[in-house]
Swiss-Prot record:
Residues 2-180 form the Guanylate kinase-like domain. This is Guanylate kinase. The gene is gmk. Gene3D superfamilies: Guanylate Kinase phosphate binding domain (3.30.63.10), P-loop containing nucleotide triphosphate hydrolases (3.40.50.300). Essential for recycling GMP and indirectly, cGMP. Coiled coil: none annotated. PROSITE patterns: GUANYLATE_KINASE_1 (PS00856), GUANYLATE_KINASE_2 (PS50052).
């Protein structure tokens, strides 16, 4: 039986970058592909970027228990299909879910043995600097991200471990150790 690891943390903390580095060094890790009701963006491919579903199909998956976790953001739904995760775990592979806080809480309820890791910034000020440094969000969007980040940071005590991402290489080594890969 494989192991299930959940990683969450606020926007701008470096989850995506850290997961990319983790996968480059550990190709045996399987990362779940999310389902969504939003329309595909240019270059996105079915089954690789997301599984694109109608709202009706997504709602049916929720009702059937076909999603490990799901949430709605900005009018679109996102979730983690249950069957592929269970198949990979049965095959003995390490499985990684990079999801939002509420999704991590949902997974905890259905997979109590999942290792839950919270990725934290070295400080709130550094997190704000990173979010502003992207240069992609309006001031209103930045304020929304920061408000949400405060809520998420207050929940880090719910997790099995907290990894502070102030040095990418050190954070990567700590994450590998927590996942039993180091």
């Amino acid at each position: 039986m494989g192991t299930l690891t959940v990683i969450t943390g606020p926007s701008g903390v470096g989850k995506g970058t850290l997961v990319q580095r983790l996968l480059a060094r550990n190709p045996s890790i399987w990362v779940s592909v999310s389902a969504t009701t939003r329309a595909p963006r240019e270059g996105e491919r079915e089954g690789e970027s997301y599984f694109f579903h109608s709202r009706e199909r997504f709602d049916a998956l929720v009702q059937e228990g076909g999603l490990l976790e799901w949430a709605e953001f900005a009018g679109n739904c996102y979730g983690t299909p249950r069957a592929p995760v269970e198949q990979q775990l049965q095959a003995g592979r390490p499985v990684l879910l990079e999801i939002e806080l509420e999704g991590a809480r949902q997974v905890r309820r259905s997979f109590s043995k999942a290792r839950q890791i919270f990725l934290a910034p070295p400080s709130f000020e550094e997190l704000e600097r990173r979010i502003r440094g992207r240069g992609t969000d309006s001031e209103d969007a930045i304020q929304q991200r920061l408000l949400r980040a405060r809520e998420e940071l207050s929940a880090q005590g719910e997790f099995d471990a907290v990894v502070v991402n102030d040095d990418l290489d050190q954070a990567l080594l700590k994450l590998e150790g927590l996942m039993g890969l180091g």
